[in-house]
From Swiss-Prot:
Its EC number is 2.4.2.9. NCBIfam families: PRK05205.1-1, PRK05205.1-4, PRK05205.1-5. It comes from the Bacteria. The gene is pyrR. One of its GO terms (biological process) is regulation of DNA-templated transcription. Belongs to the purine/pyrimidine phosphoribosyltransferase family. PyrR subfamily. This is Bifunctional protein PyrR. Regulates the transcription of the pyrimidine nucleotide (pyr) operon in response to exogenous pyrimidines. Also displays a weak uracil phosphoribosyltransferase activity which is not physiologically significant. It catalyses: UMP + diphosphate = 5-phospho-alpha-D-ribose 1-diphosphate + uracil. Coiled coil: none annotated.
């Protein structure tokens, strides 16, 4: 049986997202030209939560979309026809926008690389910034998050899970040993 440790409870997750929202606003000097794009699936829910925090702070809605990376992954050669493909939903152009790419856990960097490739196929953003709830280290690629909720050094055999409730609200972050 796996040994589970709660790293962040619900209120800890909320505080981390609120802090990330403030950091995003500070770095970008407000919300002008800003869009949020979550990586399916957990990143989408966190992007929506981040958008809610930005409304609470600034009183302005920031466009929020979703990107599916299935066809951009580097580990599917020869298996692509067997993978379920989600939908990229960007109800706005990213052309010239400041894109904040959102994911739940940053590990090797391969998911982020795939997401950036998918975004670049959608247009030329003025910049892409990365916000993650948890950074657990162990990069295979030179990827670094601009905004991090919590750094949690792990071994490669451990796992980090962000749990969501039925309404897709993050409830806790769990370290599985």
């Amino acid at each position: 049986m796996a040994d589970n440790t709660v790293i962040l409870d619900g209120s800890g997750v909320k505080r981390a997202l609120t802090r990330i929202a403030h950091e995003v606003l500070e770095k970008n000097k407000g919300v002008e030209g800003l869009v949020l794009v979550g990586i399916r699936t957990g990143g989408v829910f966190l992007a929506q939560e981040l958008a809610e925090r930005l409304v609470e702070i600034e009183g302005v809605e920031v466009p929020c979309g979703a990107v599916d990376i299935t066809m951009y992954r580097d580990d599917i050669k020869g298996h692509a026809e067997h993978l379920p493909v989600g939908k990229t939903e960007l109800p706005f152009s990213i052309e010239g926008k400041k894109v904040v790419l959102v994911d739940d856990v940053l590990f090797t960097g391969r998911t982020i690389r795939a997401a950036m490739d998918a975004l670049m196929d959608q247009g030329r953003a003025s910049c892409i910034q990365l916000a993650v709830l948890v950074d657990r280290g162990h990069r295979d690629l030179p990827i670094r998050a601009d905004f991090v909720g919590r750094n949690v050094p792990t071994s490669r055999s451990e796992n980090i899970v962000v749990a969501f409730d039925a309404g897709n609200k993050p409830t806790e972050v769990i370290l599985q040993k």
